[in-house]
A protein has these predicted regions:
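Bacterial Sec-dependent N-terminal signal peptides
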Residues: 1-22
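Hydrophobic beta-strand positions that form the internal "hydrophobic ladder"
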Residues: 104, 154-158, 201-202, 260, ...
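A flexible loop/linker signature enriched in serine peptidases of the S9 family
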Residues: 109-116, 138-142, 161-170, 185-189, ...
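Beta-propeller blade signature
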Residues: 120-121, 172-176, 219-229, 274-278, ...
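A conserved hydrophobic secondary-structure block that centers on an alpha-helix together
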Residues: 130-193
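Cap/lid segment of the alpha/beta-hydrolase catalytic domain
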Residues: 135-148, 161-166, 180, 413-419, ...
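Active-site-proximal cap/loop segments of hydrolase catalytic domains
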Residues: 500-698
């Protein structure tokens, strides 16, 4: 969408105080669209806003952005918050080193660079030499690096970029001996990396869209093989399955180029797995699994032994061992059985395995032998989030550790002594010891025990009037663990409390916890979030006049649903890039892929009724006094299309019966969030904090 100043919208403001304004909201384009679901008619008056290319929609977007900017830019705390956000983000950030073809690589950000830069080292800890700087690919940081893949001979680097936050990807190839890019260029790739094999690589893509590239439904995912030195139009179609147009396909190849895996996903919460013996050029794929409701991931191949991470027969995950000779699941052997804690991932290093578990939403890691023997727990600094990096043939093993107030610190782990030492530690731009984090457990509506983290200043008086930023997600088997973001620090310094609730729908306690927040149990997620808010009020951390709820994507749905169900409970609501139209979400881009978690309005009358019962867009009521609401979206969000936020904003503005503002912030040259330039992140967070605090009377 081209968001330009198509006309100047006259703003009428009643007073100079930003929170005491009379809002004359822009008139949104409407029509008389009515859809019929199982005999029930549902009006969709703002359907024209689904066309983000129309002149009417662009005019409305421009007018809404003018109104929003006029409000936000006048908030007295914004300059101070913006300045502090830049200060706390301005520190050197170094990732975990990794080795490819006997060369060490690392990502580094000098401080306020929009994107981190890939470097190589002459030796571990040695001089850094620039390999790839995404900041040089655009003037404003809106080209992001989405993935890299080294050829098995070490000469080439295929790198994947995305422009303006879109899910659409392009692939380029760099010759590491000369440092120059080849002429090879792949467009319209999506959801996959380059898988090297022979003199080229495999990649996943869709046909080039004829129009509406950022909203039209993506169908028939294909795998191509690209031979270096040729044009994309000459690429060989390697695999497609038109019988199942709503599935994703991707291949990976082991480093010896003896085994290829094909992953098929998209119609269930898991995937199918296929394997092919590349030693025999006439070999075909052999199906290893046939259950799209379970997850199967080949995490390592040693010879013809295949180590597979799965939740099949193990809701909290386990590690299985297969062999190319008999690869079917019935011949697999259990290597590490399911534990009482959730297994998150497995890293191979120096002839060992590191198994990373989650216990009450924090990392607990253990060293294992290759035959599945537990050799002891790896001591971590505190409650937090650890991420390991290593190679089965390398002595060196690293992990990054962070918590809510601990910036990512890289440790080198010795598998022989089972000890860690700091490899790199950032210099904090704030006083870390002034904050405290505690974990509490509260009871949800149906009696379920739910964990929650709270972070705040040690000297904070819990007087029941502290500003609270309550964050949640609750979906798609994704766990929220403690992790560091400098963006939180200014809010905490202002006396705010950051709260992260571990709702059902995530993976905090395995597949059962996930399923308890899906389809016709989705209300559990909203009940968990509402119960978290009520617990915070009952325990004198805050009151309803100082409580903000925030969530993005599926978390935006969470905020939208809670806003409509309990408008009396919250002072401020921030639904970010949210799924807000639950009756039509599956009609756009890859929305169909979310059906295993949500169900669709076409599944059955019962499913339609359930979705209609909580869909944020369809549960707004005229004349209700809704909380102050700042809706955020972006023009290039082709994951959750901006139409969700557009229609929700227009409807909420028309329904608002109170005096609290209802604004929408529509970013340009941005997408769903991944790869967003640091400068844009800082500007957005300054807007959010200033909006929250202003509407709490701060």
């Amino acid at each position: 969408m081209n968001i330009k100043m198509l006309f100047t919208f006259p703003l009428t403001l009643a007073a100079t105080c930003a929170t005491a304004q009379t809002f004359h909201y822009p008139k949104a384009p409407q029509n008389n669209t009515i859809d019929t679901y199982f005999g029930t008619q549902i009006a969709d008056p703002y359907r024209p806003l689904e066309d983000d290319n129309s002149i009417e929609t662009q005019r409305w977007v421009t007018a809404e952005n003018e109104l929003t900017r006029h409000y936000l830019d006048r908030l007295p705390m914004r300059p101070k918050l913006l300045k502090r956000l830049k200060e706390v983000a301005n520190y050197e950030k170094i990732g975990t080193p990794f080795k490819r073809n006997n060369t060490w690589y690392v990502y580094k950000n000098n401080g306020l660079q929009n994107q981190s830069v890939l470097y190589k080292m002459d030796k571990l800890g040695g001089t850094l030499y620039e390999v790839l700087d995404p900041n040089k690919l655009s003037t404003d940081g809106t080209v992001a690096l989405k993935g890299i893949s080294f050829s098995h001979n070490g000469r080439y680097l295929a790198y994947v970029i995305a422009r303006n936050g879109s899910d659409w990807q392009e692939i380029y190839v760099k010759d590491l001996t000369t440092g120059k890019d080849l002429a090879d260029h792949i467009e319209w790739a999506k959801f996959g990396n380059a898988a090297w094999c022979g003199d080229g690589f495999y990649y996943s893509a869709y046909d080039a869209p004829s129009n509406h590239a950022f909203t039209s439904k993506n169908e028939v995912h294909k795998i191509y093989y690209h031979h270096l030195g040729t044009a994309q139009k000459e690429d060989r179609l390697f695999y497609q399955n038109p019988a199942y147009p709503l599935r994703f396909y991707a291949v990976t190849v082991n480093k010896e180029e003896t085994i290829m895996y094909l992953t098929e996903s998209g119609e269930g919460s898991g995937n199918n797995l296929y394997v092919r013996d590349l030693r025999n050029k006439d070999s075909q794929f052999i199906q290893m699994t046939n259950d799209m409701n379970c997850h199967y991931e080949p995490v390592e191949t040693i010879g013809y032994d295949i180590y597979i991470f799965t939740n099949s027969g193990a809701p909290k995950n386990r590690l299985m061992l297969a062999n190319l000779a008999k690869p079917g699941i019935k011949d697999w052997k259990e290597l590490v059985p399911e534990s009482q804690n959730v297994l998150n991932d497995v890293t191979f290093t120096h002839g060992k395995m590191v198994l990373n578990y989650s216990k009450d939403a924090s990392s607990h890691c253990y060293l294992y032998s290759l035959d599945g023997r537990n050799e002891g727990e790896i001591k971590l600094p505190s409650l937090g989030n650890a991420s390991f990096s290593g190679d089965r043939n390398d002595v060196e093993c690293f992990y990054s550790f962070s918590s809510f107030t601990t910036p990512g610190t890289v440790y080198q782990f010795d598998t022989n002594t089972k000890t860690s030492r700091i490899y790199s530690q950032p210099k904090a731009t704030f006083k870390q010891n002034q904050f405290v984090t505690k974990q509490v457990f509260y009871t949800s509506k149906d009696g379920t025990r739910v964990p929650m983290f709270l972070t705040y200043r040690r000297d904070l008086k819990l007087n029941g009037k502290n500003p609270v930023y309550l964050y949640g997600y609750g979906g798609f088997n994704i766990a929220l663990q403690p992790y560091f973001s400098s963006m939180r620090i200014p809010f905490l310094e202002q006396g705010g409390i950051y709260v992260q609730a571990n709702l059902r729908g995530g993976s905090e306690y395995g597949e059962a916890w996930h399923q308890a927040g899906t389809k016709m149990q989705k209300q559990n997620v909203f009940d968990d979030f509402i119960a978290a808010a009520e617990w915070l009020i009952a325990n004198k951390y805050t009151d309803k006049h100082h409580l903000a709820i925030v969530g993005g994507s599926n978390g935006g749905l969470l905020v939208g649903a809670c806003l409509t169900q309990r408008p009396d409970l919250f002072q401020v609501c921030i639904p970010q890039v949210g799924v807000l139209d639950m009756l039509r979400y599956h009609r756009f881009t890859i929305g169909w892929n979310w059906a295993p978690d949500y169900g669709t309005s076409a599944d059955s009358k019962a499913m339609f009724d359930y979705l209609r019962g909580y869909s944020p867009l369809h549960n707004l009521k005229k004349g209700v006094s809704y909380p102050a609401t700042l809706i955020t979206t972006a023009d290039h969000d082709d994951r959750v299309v901006p139409a969700h936020s557009f229609k929700f904003a227009a409807t909420l503005q028309a329904c608002q019966g109170g005096k609290a503002p209802v604004l929408i912030r529509i970013d340009s040259k941005a997408g769903h969030g991944a790869g967003k330039p640091l400068s844009k992140q800082i500007e957005e967070q300054a807007d959010i904090y200033s909006f929250i605090l202003a509407n709490m009377g701060k």
